[in-house]
């Protein structure tokens, strides 16, 4: 989250495991009334979601927002495509990135900032299996170093 503001609602934990995130953007979401109520209740899943640039606009696909319990007939479709609000310069940068081979737009975090739902969108390149193994080895080595350091402290 930029500048440490906002209340974290949902986080895509697999994103950093599956992608090398090179750049992040903060985007607003176009939502219906019952969707924002469900988001505030924390009933959101970013797991399989992704963003696409279509006709000069950015859309978020497969983000699951559970129907609002008191919404009755005004409830929304949980998996509908939602428009992301970004500046024109940012959209043109994203178009340039997505035209390059291997880059994807991955939602990283969903949070509420100043009363509005915001999405942290990352531009990432997919990791191969050996990259993931390498990262796991680095993390394990770091844990070993920290463990040894703590043992010396005692």
Curated annotation (Swiss-Prot):
Residues 126-154 are annotated as: Disordered. Keywords: Cytoplasm, RNA-binding. GO terms for biological process: trans-translation. Disulfide bonds: none annotated. Residues 131-154 have a biased composition (Basic and acidic residues). InterPro entries: SmpB, SsrA-bd_prot, SsrA-bd_prot_CS. GO terms for molecular function: RNA binding. Pfam families: SmpB (PF01668). Required for rescue of stalled ribosomes mediated by trans-translation. Binds to transfer-messenger RNA (tmRNA), required for stable association of tmRNA with ribosomes. tmRNA and SmpB together mimic tRNA shape, replacing the anticodon stem-loop with SmpB. tmRNA is encoded by the ssrA gene; the 2 termini fold to resemble tRNA(Ala) and it encodes a 'tag peptide', a short internal open reading frame. During trans-translation Ala-aminoacylated tmRNA acts like a tRNA, entering the A-site of stalled ribosomes, displacing the stalled mRNA. This is SsrA-binding protein.
């Amino acid at each position: 989250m930029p500048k440490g503001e906002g209340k974290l609602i949902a986080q895509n934990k697999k994103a950093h495991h599956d992608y090398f995130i090179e750049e992040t953007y903060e985007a607003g979401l176009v939502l219906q009334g019952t969707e924002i109520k469900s988001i505030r209740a924390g009933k959101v899943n970013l797991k399989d979601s992704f963003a696409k640039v279509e006709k000069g606009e950015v859309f978020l696909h497969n983000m699951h927002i559970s129907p609002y319990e008191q919404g009755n007939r005004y409830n929304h479709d949980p998996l509908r495509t939602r428009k992301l609000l970004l500046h024109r310069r940012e959209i043109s940068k994203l178009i340039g990135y997505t035209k390059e081979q291997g880059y994807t737009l991955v939602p990283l975090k969903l949070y509420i900032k100043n009363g509005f739902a915001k999405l942290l969108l990352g531009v990432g390149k997919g990791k191969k299996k050996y990259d993931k193994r390498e990262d796991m080895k680095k993390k394990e080595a770091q844990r070993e170093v920290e463990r040894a350091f703590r043992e010396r402290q005692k």
